[in-house]
């Protein structure tokens, strides 16, 4: 079956009639980075007070660990604003870190023992304690090392004018159904061809040997001092060594419709795990995990892309989707780009604009479990050996087998058309330039981020030395930066407000933690 069909051109023509559509994409970035100390080791200090409450600051929080910062931009419709806001957040954060720096890549710096990794703390409220307990569960299930691998998440949505162009006037119910159906079509095409993202932008071909710490691996690593690497790898972060989850391989969550997806997710959070039950849930009065199901909560589901809707207060992600349908998608396959202080570049954003729009406008057949397994196989090949020229990928269980290069050129033939239309809407040639640059990378794997980073690591003698050198340079750049979109006053105001909000949440608690958890998980009964 030929998966790149001509319907794309017809749909593109419809949308292109209103050029404003291409100026109204909604975008947001979430960037994770480890705080580290002078000697290139993970910071053991608590979240800096000058950053406010990690629980309630809308721009600066923490992920798994107390030392794992997460920066969240507001949604914007302009790429310069998006990246400028990310710059501002980095600048303010660095001013509050003293001598500490931000680790500039996905794979962590040197970690002597897992005990050095303190779980993120959010205060004394029930909801804060639940967040930390969820992390305790992750630690016991998968180990802390896997959880401190950093990534970049890219949130993306189409404007209403996009749907108007494709479907004309619709009732609210029809529009909700149309959007959900189209976003799931996008998600299926992302599974089919999204391996382009780790091919181009994967930036974790190597890791510190301390990261393995007794874990077995069948991957044929080569050693450079204390650094282990795979010569043709693009993203170890997305490999079985990184943030994937074998316990979840029993789950069969489909992407053919919102109903199928929600049904699969609902089943997953109710499926008991014999393996996790052995860990115990509450032993000697102390909680070890939220529950012993395959997923403690929905967020534990590993996925390279997620359908999303902003949840109302107290609403679970699936409840928000069931209520209002898909509002935007979250791309979760980006490694931290080590060649920029903020972890993502304008070229990457432009490629994601093009690729996600193409994935939404292209034909997207339903996928069965066999086909899903096929896509996973392609992704696994690309993350472990994607720079092996001529690597063969099979699109679809019974589909064609072609080289990565042949598939990529097929996709780019249509991305180029889209880039021209989007450039014409903006009155420049920026999308075409991004397209041309990346198309060269298809036949020149040495231009990809993973290849550039591996060369640098080999020149410097180790991943640690490379990270420290880049981190030092970015610290200076971040400190020298001048606010472009936020102001110091806005940043300080958010810090103060976050502390007030945390205190209010703590004072509003009316039940003990046991009761709170029982109430939260009542829906599982």
UniProtKB/Swiss-Prot annotation:
This protein's gene is called gshA
What Gene3D superfamilies does the entry give? 3.30.590.20
Q: What is the lineage of its organism?
A: Bacteria, Pseudomonadati, Pseudomonadota, Gammaproteobacteria, Vibrionales
Q: In which pathway does it act?
A: Sulfur metabolism; glutathione biosynthesis; glutathione from L-cysteine and L-glutamate: step 1/2
What is the name of this protein? Answer: Glutamate--cysteine ligase
Q: Does the record bear Membrane in its keywords?
A: no
Query: Could you say which protein family the record assigns here?
Result: Belongs to the glutamate--cysteine ligase type 1 family. Type 1 subfamily.
What is the species of this protein?
Vibrio vulnificus (strain YJ016)
Q: Show the catalytic activity.
A: L-cysteine + L-glutamate + ATP = gamma-L-glutamyl-L-cysteine + ADP + phosphate + H(+)
GO cellular component, alphabetical, reads: cytosol
């Amino acid at each position: 079956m030929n998966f790149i069909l001509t319907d794309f051109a017809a749909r593109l023509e419809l949308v292109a009639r209103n050029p404003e559509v291409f100026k109204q994409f909604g975008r947001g970035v979430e960037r994770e980075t480890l705080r580290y100390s002078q000697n290139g080791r993970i910071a053991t200090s608590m979240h800096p007070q000058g950053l406010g409450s990690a629980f309630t600051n809308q721009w600066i929080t923490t992920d798994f660990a107390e030392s794992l910062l997460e920066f969240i931009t507001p949604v914007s419709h302009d790429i310069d604003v998006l990246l400028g806001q990310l710059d501002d957040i980095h600048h303010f954060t660095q001013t509050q870190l003293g001598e500490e720096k931000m680790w500039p890549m996905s794979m962590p710096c040197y970690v002597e023992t897992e005990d050095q990794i303190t779980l993120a703390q959010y205060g004394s409220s029930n909801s804060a304690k639940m967040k930390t307990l969820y992390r305790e569960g992750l630690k016991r299930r998968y180990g802390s090392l896997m959880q401190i691998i950093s990534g970049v998440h890219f949130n993306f949505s189409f404007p209403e004018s996009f749907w108007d162009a494709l479907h004309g006037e619709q009732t609210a119910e029809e529009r909700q159904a149309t959007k959900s159906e189209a976003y799931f079509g996008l998600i299926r095409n992302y599974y089919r061809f999204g391996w382009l993202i780790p091919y181009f932008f994967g930036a974790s071909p190597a890791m510190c040997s301390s990261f393995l710490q007794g874990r077995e691996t069948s991957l044929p690593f080569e050693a450079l001092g204390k650094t282990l690497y795979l010569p043709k790898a693009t993203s170890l972060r997305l490999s079985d060594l990184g943030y994937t989850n074998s316990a979840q391989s029993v789950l069969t969550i489909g992407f053919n419709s919102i109903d199928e997806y929600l049904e699969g997710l609902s089943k997953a959070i109710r499926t008991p795990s014999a393996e996790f039950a052995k860990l115990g849930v509450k032993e000697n009065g102390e909680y070890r995990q939220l529950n012993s199901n395959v997923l403690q909560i929905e967020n534990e589901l590993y996925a390279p892309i997620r359908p999303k809707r902003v949840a109302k207060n107290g609403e679970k992600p699936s409840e928000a989707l069931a209520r209002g349908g898909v509002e935007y998608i979250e791309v979760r396959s980006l490694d931290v780009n080590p060649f920029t202080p903020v972890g993502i570049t304008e070229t990457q954003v432009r490629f994601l604009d093009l690729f996600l729009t193409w994935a939404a406008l292209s034909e997207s057949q339903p996928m069965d479990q066999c086909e899903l397994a096929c896509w996973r196989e392609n992704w696994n090949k690309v993350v472990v050996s994607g720079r092996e020229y001529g690597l063969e990928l099979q699109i679809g269980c019974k589909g064609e087998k072609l080289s990565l290069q042949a598939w990529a050129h097929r996709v780019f033939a249509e991305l180029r058309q889209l880039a021209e239309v989007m450039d014409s809407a903006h009155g420049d040639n920026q999308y075409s330039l991004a397209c041309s640059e990346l198309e060269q990378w298809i036949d020149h794997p040495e231009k990809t981020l993973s290849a550039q980073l591996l060369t640098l690591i080999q020149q410097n003698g180790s991943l640690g030395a490379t990270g420290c050198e880049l981190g030092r340079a970015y610290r200076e750049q971040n400190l020298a930066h001048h606010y472009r979109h936020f102001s110091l006053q806005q940043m300080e105001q958010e810090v103060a407000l976050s502390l007030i909000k945390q205190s209010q949440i703590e004072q509003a608690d009316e039940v003990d933690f046991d009761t709170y958890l029982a109430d939260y998980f009542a829906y599982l009964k």
